[in-house]
Amino acid sequence: MATNGVVISCLREVRPPMTKHAPSMWTDTFSNFSLDDKEQQKCSETIEALKQEARGMLMAATTPLQQMTLIDTLERLGLSFHFETEIEYKIELINAAEDDGFDLFATALRFRLLRQHQRHVSCDVFDKFIDKDGKFEESLSNNVEGLLSLYEAAHVGFREERILQEAVNFTRHHLEGAELDQSPLLIREKVKRALEHPLHRDFPIVYARLFISIYEKDDSRDELLLKLSKVNFKFMQNLYKEELSQLSRWWNTWNLKSKLPYARDRVVEAYVWGVGYHYEPQYSYVRMGLAKGVLICGIMDDTYDNYATLNEAQLFTQVLDKWDRDEAERLPEYMKIVYRFILSIYENYERDAAKLGKSFAAPYFKETVKQLARAFNEEQKWVMERQLPSFQDYVKNSEKTSCIYTMFASIIPGLKSVTQETIDWIKSEPTLATSTAMIGRYWNDTSSQLRESKGGEMLTALDFHMKEYGLTKEEAASKFEGLVEETWKDINKEFIATTNYNVGREIAITFLNYARICEASYSKTDGDAYSDPNVAKANVVALFVDAIVF
């Protein structure tokens, strides 16, 4: 017994094997950017003029099909935020319209748009395309545009809607085997992207940047919408680069890449998450705040997971729980830096929240950081002491280590619709929050190169699942892919259900976008976009480097 106690005592002083993270590939790429106010003003004036014409076009659309295709195009081009009132008005008309005469393309488009706009619509609308054997009619297999529309619609389904799972299988099979050479370029490119990233799960502004390039080559394009989308993206890209410049300079003042060499230097990648949450111009605080929230999460994760001993981790958790600057003196030097970094961000946050009428958010932000520390500490003990908890215990802890609560808290001052009641709702751990949290964890654990090696052993949810259910690694990975699919269905259902809880669309979209970013950030073959800069590179280049060509 005494020997066992000595072993445990020694173990608590052992540092985990340190992962050497790749350096930032961006260094000072964005820190010296200077916004041209005159150029922005010119863009703004052009946007306003073109918006008036586009608004007239939208309001002049009379048939449901005209309305739906135009709304879909505006959303794909990243322009819908300019026309929210008009689009919601048209969505109500579409919802009220009879759909008996709609073909597969129109039926599926209507279904998807209504659900994405939080309207209750039954999947029974697809019954007319089912044969006597309960399968989709094979005659549909030659209709590529209809198949694509059904494929996209099927990804807004719920768990209980078996017809939509059948739709995914049916459409994917036929789209993957389709001869697309004779199809219009726009259809070919849409199919290619959808099979990689279904539209409902795609990174909205990254998709918009891609779609502008595709739309430009389409013979049926509308020149007005093309020009508006280009000027709009140019305006937003300049805004993003200005925000990223400010953020980079702030980050450099901390010099954490030298002071905390075990931690990932990822300010640009953190800002990508901010753009993913809300890309629209009015959400500048959200993007900047989210980036700082991500950096807190990343540094805490690396401190617990990549450097701290168990004793140091326990001490840090206790000190953070007291939330007192004077307590920093109890910490090792490197932890003092981490602690002061967190408190500095919080103090600025507290001031911002007060200015923006969101003082009630500050205690919640503090609470989520403490909660995150406790969850990271628990996870590190499992890893270092080689304790495999039950899969359910791991999942419960993972809801916290997903960082979703700290991330959401970090942006509250920039969300007009958030109230104390919103925070109370989130603290009740609603399904929308827990499901989006688990999307990130499931992708984390199924991403092959993301599985963290500890002294030659791997410890992730896959390990817990393999042990508890006697599965091979491949079987566990397949099970997790299934969990991702089922969890998305829960998100889809709760996204609509929030309209019954007095939770605004702005908040529901925020959680939905978290899941979308997770989907875009993890790869089964290349790892994750925060740990490996090469995975995030394409998105960074598309959003902040490559200029729109007019």
From Swiss-Prot:
- Which reaction does this chain catalyze? (2E,6E)-farnesyl diphosphate = (E)-beta-farnesene + diphosphate
Per UniProt, the short sequence motif DDXXD motif occupies residue numbers 301-305
State where Mg(2+) 1 binds: 301, 305
According to the UniProt entry, where is the signal peptide?
none
Name the Gene Ontology biological process terms. defense response; diterpenoid biosynthetic process
Q: What single Pfam family name could you report for this chain, choosing any that match? A: Terpene_synth
**Gene Ontology molecular function terms on file:** magnesium ion binding; terpene synthase activity
Pathway assigned to this chain's UniProt record? Secondary metabolite biosynthesis; terpenoid biosynthesis
- The EC class name is lyase
Q: Which Gene3D superfamilies match?
A: Farnesyl Diphosphate Synthase, Terpene synthase, N-terminal domain
Q: Which residues bind Mg(2+) 2?
A: 301, 305
Where is it located?
Cytoplasm
Cofactor field: Mg(2+); Mn(2+)
**GO-annotated cellular components:** cytoplasm
Please tell me where this protein is predominantly located: cytoplasm
Q: Which PANTHER family match?
A: OS04G0344100 PROTEIN-RELATED, SESQUITERPENE SYNTHASE 31
Functional summary from the UniProt entry: Involved in the production of (E)-beta-farnesene, an aphid alarm pheromone. Can use both farnesyl diphosphate and geranyl diphosphate as substrate, but not geranylgeranyl diphosphate. Produces mainly (E)-beta-farnesene, but also smaller amounts of (Z)-beta-farnesene and gamma-cadinene when used with farnesyl diphosphate as substrate. In the presence of geranyl diphosphate, produces limonene, terpinolene and the acyclic monoterpene myrcene along with minor amounts of gamma-terpinene, (Z)-ocimene, (E)-ocimene and sabinene.
Q: What is the official name of this protein in its record?
A: Beta-farnesene synthase
- Please give the organism: Mentha piperita
